[in-house]
């Protein structure tokens, strides 16, 4: 269970870092917004799922 928690936490940190860089770039360029809209929404959903998963796994690890 600890390994799964660590992998989920690493994925959350990596996705957070990518979204901190990618979302402002997508919002700043008007031509990229139409192309990046679905990717931003999927990333947001994945981030939310990872936050919940890390919280649940934290309950089982500690």
From Swiss-Prot:
The chain crosses the membrane at residues 8-28, 41-61. Pfam families: Ycf9. GO terms for biological process: photosynthesis; photosystem II stabilization. GO terms for cellular component: photosystem II reaction center; plasma membrane-derived thylakoid membrane. Keywords: Membrane, Photosynthesis, Photosystem II, Reaction center, Thylakoid, Transmembrane, Transmembrane helix. SUPFAM superfamilies: PsbZ-like. Its main location: membrane. It is a multi-pass membrane protein. InterPro entries: PSII_PsbZ, PSII_PsbZ_sf. It is found in: Cellular thylakoid membrane. May control the interaction of photosystem II (PSII) cores with the light-harvesting antenna, regulates electron flow through the 2 photosystem reaction centers. PSII is a light-driven water plastoquinone oxidoreductase, using light energy to abstract electrons from H(2)O, generating a proton gradient subsequently used for ATP formation. Belongs to the PsbZ family. HAMAP family: PSII_PsbZ. PSII is composed of 1 copy each of membrane proteins PsbA, PsbB, PsbC, PsbD, PsbE, PsbF, PsbH, PsbI, PsbJ, PsbK, PsbL, PsbM, PsbT, PsbX, PsbY, PsbZ, Psb30/Ycf12, peripheral proteins PsbO, CyanoQ (PsbQ), PsbU, PsbV and a large number of cofactors. It forms dimeric complexes. This is Photosystem II reaction center protein Z. It comes from Picosynechococcus sp. (strain ATCC 27264 / PCC 7002 / PR-6) (Agmenellum quadruplicatum). The gene is psbZ.
């Amino acid at each position: 269970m600890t390994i799964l928690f660590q992998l989920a936490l690493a994925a959350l940190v990596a996705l957070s870092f990518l979204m901190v860089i990618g979302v402002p770039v997508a919002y700043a360029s008007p031509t990229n917004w139409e192309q990046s809209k679905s990717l931003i929404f999927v990333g947001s959903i994945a981030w939310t799922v990872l936050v919940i998963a890390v919280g649940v796994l934290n309950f089982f690890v500690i």
